[in-house]
Curated annotation (Swiss-Prot):
<dbReference type="InterPro" id="IPR012340">
    <property type="entry name" value="NA-bd_OB-fold"/>
</dbReference>
<dbReference type="Pfam" id="PF07497">
    <property type="entry name" value="Rho_RNA_bind"/>
</dbReference>
<keyword id="KW-0806">Transcription termination</keyword>
<keyword id="KW-0804">Transcription</keyword>
<protein>
    <recommendedName>
        <fullName>Transcription termination factor Rho</fullName>
        <ecNumber>3.6.4.-</ecNumber>
    </recommendedName>
</protein>
<dbReference type="InterPro" id="IPR027417">
    <property type="entry name" value="P-loop_NTPase"/>
</dbReference>
<feature type="binding site">
    <location>
        <begin position="173"/>
        <end position="178"/>
    </location>
    <ligand>
        <name>ATP</name>
    </ligand>
</feature>
<feature type="domain" description="Rho RNA-BD">
    <location>
        <begin position="55"/>
        <end position="130"/>
    </location>
</feature>
<dbReference type="Pfam" id="PF07498">
    <property type="entry name" value="Rho_N"/>
</dbReference>
<comment type="function">
    <text>Facilitates transcription termination by a mechanism that involves Rho binding to the nascent RNA, activation of Rho's RNA-dependent ATPase activity, and release of the mRNA from the DNA template.</text>
</comment>
<keyword id="KW-0547">Nucleotide-binding</keyword>
<keyword id="KW-0067">ATP-binding</keyword>
<dbReference type="GO" id="GO:0003723">
    <property type="term" value="F:RNA binding"/>
</dbReference>
<dbReference type="InterPro" id="IPR003593">
    <property type="entry name" value="AAA+_ATPase"/>
</dbReference>
<dbReference type="InterPro" id="IPR011129">
    <property type="entry name" value="CSD"/>
</dbReference>
<keyword id="KW-0347">Helicase</keyword>
<dbReference type="InterPro" id="IPR000194">
    <property type="entry name" value="ATPase_F1/V1/A1_a/bsu_nucl-bd"/>
</dbReference>
Length: 427
């Protein structure tokens, strides 16, 4: 490789077209470069360039310590401290105005004698952008929140009915704060996976994060293997203080990405368990709600859920979180009541439908999105309202079965809505 190629910066790579990037990738011997998206290809080139000079290329999520230095935590290690962490010096943090949660990529060196960690010697990119972009960022708390105005299209395979139903009855916009109200065994995890894959297929530039709190380890493996998303997990066998750390660093990472104008989606399973974990970790305030919930423990989960917003200045943070109901636990009931009404979209799952093995077990009448008129065009909106009026005259089971039968006869929601025109006269 020529000396000139060794010094290509991320800014220069971003300004190149895909054909030029392919030529560089070919000369560097990068495998399967034609199947990569542009951003992934740029980072593969940076990595290959760095390694050809005898150094390493490293990346991680920055956690700054009170003493002023920081470490890059690996997503593969669920953002927890490990021996593979990369040291960032206080001077680098000050020079580039870095914050906890920034994703840092750059040239790293091996630990010297007496050192324990790899160290960053040159920062190449901050949040997948050239380092100069840090000067244009607006702090997350100073961004103006707005209603979601641009819809995520989730519909993919005609046979995946859950995403088709969500698109019609509870559309998700960029910046939505959504809650999936789920009794046990109603299929919430399957719906989360289908939402993640729907966004991945139709909106590939969106950064998708699935955050699993207090879940079973085998479920974590299943979600990792079946979704196209970043999966960060704090399973039930992890100490509560570490689970809290994972959740907080994940939120900081998402906020930093929004500051850089990315559309970020966090799928949280589950908000109830996150609140339970905080209830263990937070120092007692001396007051107790029914079920043993400390009111002080609910502040941080509310802060997490409340971070979801569309912003007028650019990026958006969408959070779709599951809330557990009908578990037999008074604590879960209190947590759900505290969060009820804080979201602007609700998807309600039904235990009765799930018991009869009618999936997706969605209660269509109780599910919906606030200000859906900002997300759906007028024609679609009228037809969805007509469907709701039809469903109100039927039982929960009859309504869902009718809609699922009609969806199975059509290959897309567009075709399904045209079918309504033909049958309108009958109702």
């Amino acid at each position: 490789m020529s000396e000139e190629q060794k010094t290509i910066s991320i800014s220069e790579l971003e300004s190149m077209n895909i054909k030029q990037l392919y030529e560089i990738a070919k000369s560097l011997g990068i495998p399967r470069y034609t199947s990569m998206r542009k951003r992934d290809l740029i980072f593969a080139i940076l990595k290959a360039q760095t390694e050809s000079t005898g150094y390493f290329f490293g990346e991680g999520v920055l956690e700054i310590h009170p003493e002023g230095f920081g470490f890059l935590r690996r997503i593969e290690d669920n953002l927890l401290p490990s021996n593979d962490d990369i040291y960032i010096s206080p001077s680098q943090i000050r020079k580039f105005n870095l914050n906890t949660g920034d994703i840092i990529s750059g040239v790293i060196r091996k630990p010297k004698e007496g050192e324990k960690y790899f160290a960053m010697i040159k920062i190449e990119a901050i949040n997948y952008r050239p380092v100069e972009a840090v000067n244009d960022r607006v702090n997350f708390d100073n961004l103006t929140p707005d209603y979601p105005r641009e819809r995520f299209i989730l519909e993919t395979d005609p046979k995946i009915y859950s995403t088709r139903l969500i698109d019609l009855f509870a559309p998700i916009g960029k910046g939505q704060r959504g809650m999936i109200v789920a009794p046990p065994k109603a299929g919430k995890t399957t719906i989360l996976k289908e939402i993640a894959n729907g966004i991945a297929e139709n909106h590939p530039d969106t950064i998708r994060i699935i955050l699993l709190i207090d879940e079973r380890p085998e479920e974590v493996t299943d979600i990792r293997e079946s979704t196209n998303a970043i999966v960060i997990a704090a399973p039930f066998d992890m100490p509560p203080d570490k689970q809290v750390k994972v959740a907080e660093l994940t939120l900081e990472m998402a906020k930093r990405l929004v500051e850089f104008n990315y559309d970020v989606v966090i799928l949280l399973d589950s908000l109830t368990r996150l609140a339970r974990v905080y209830n263990i970790v937070v120092p007692p305030s001396g007051k107790l709600l029914t079920g043993g919930v400390d009111p002080a423990a609910l502040y941080k989960p509310k802060r997490f859920f409340g971070a979801a917003r569309n912003t007028r200045e650019g990026g958006s943070l969408t959070i779709i979180a599951t809330a557990l109901v009908e578990t037999g636990s008074k604590m879960d009931e209190v947590i759900f009541e505290e969060f009820k009404g804080t979201g602007n979209m609700e998807l309600v799952l039904s235990r009765q439908l799930a018991n009869k093995r009618i999936f997706p077990a969605i209660n269509l009448l109780l599910s919906g999105t606030r200000r859906e008129e900002l997300l759906l065009d007028e024609e679609t909106l009228k037809k969805v309202w007509l469907l709701r009026r039809m469903l109100s005259a039927m039982t929960e089971e009859e309504g869902l079965t009718l809609i699922l039968n009609k969806l199975s006869e059509t290959s897309s929601n567009e075709e399904f809505l045209k079918l309504i025109d033909k049958e309108k006269a009958r109702y």
